[in-house]
């Protein structure tokens, strides 16, 4: 297969521009990989498709406020977008405008210094005075909602472009498969005997980018920092040993777990594992950790669409997408979801 095989027509009318009125009220398309059978349900009914002994793995990364404008002392306007966290500090920005090392930038009474230019349109910033670059962005910047929403961030996005269990700040895009998780759904899952575990992967802007080459081996995958706690690794091992299923909530969880598969299945390994997930998953990949996937409906030519096709099977996935369009499902970050079993 080629990248062009993952192009499809997504009508603008099927892109959800805003979150649903009530969190968790979206629809859920369920696809059985073994048969290709499709069922239509609700996200709030997820527990009805899981079994006692299954394990749900969530990404607890928190979206940080990441988009603001700053000004040079001469008056030049520079757009800044904070990039995802790698390690301890979050001080890399994507900038639009003209910058050079040593420049000063003013924003909201704060002064940034351009410490270094590290790539096309990417700079390392520092901030004068107390606090960090991340502190300034958290105080004054806007939420970094996806560009395909074609609108500015609004007050509703501060709450709804964030999961209810977000803990670890560092993402500049939400792990959207779990945006519709609610406390009530967690209660229903636990009552059924489904275990819930978490890990952290800080989602980057690369998640929105279409692939611009036509051969998989020509694409350079973006890297995202992740941490999988020891208790989550232990739960995965126990679930597998007892015949349960590991359900990844989202492509971010999938990438982290599959990238760390060697450690997950190393019975002598102890402690948490961290790394930079640069794994590019596309049809032909053999999954080692996950047994089911809860995810959104993805954009054409995106790496997350190819990952989903690798898990579901491309033919079955595109049949499911055609059905979703026919039944008027909403696509992308604020839209409906699919569960692939």
Curated annotation (Swiss-Prot):
4Fe-4S listed as a keyword: no
Signal peptide: none
Reaction(s) catalysed by this chain's protein: 7-aminomethyl-7-carbaguanosine(34) in tRNA + S-adenosyl-L-methionine = epoxyqueuosine(34) in tRNA + adenine + L-methionine + 2 H(+)
Coiled-coil ranges from the UniProt annotation: none
Gene3D superfamilies for this protein: QueA-like (3.40.1780.10)
Uppermost EC category: transferase
Localization per Swiss-Prot or TrEMBL: Cytoplasm
Main location: cytoplasm
Sorted UniProt keywords: Cytoplasm, Queuosine biosynthesis, S-adenosyl-L-methionine, Transferase
Family note: Belongs to the QueA family.
Function: Transfers and isomerizes the ribose moiety from AdoMet to the 7-aminomethyl group of 7-deazaguanine (preQ1-tRNA) to give epoxyqueuosine (oQ-tRNA).
Protein name as catalogued: S-adenosylmethionine:tRNA ribosyltransferase-isomerase
Organism this protein belongs to: Chlorobium phaeobacteroides (strain DSM 266 / SMG 266 / 2430)
Gene encoding the protein: queA
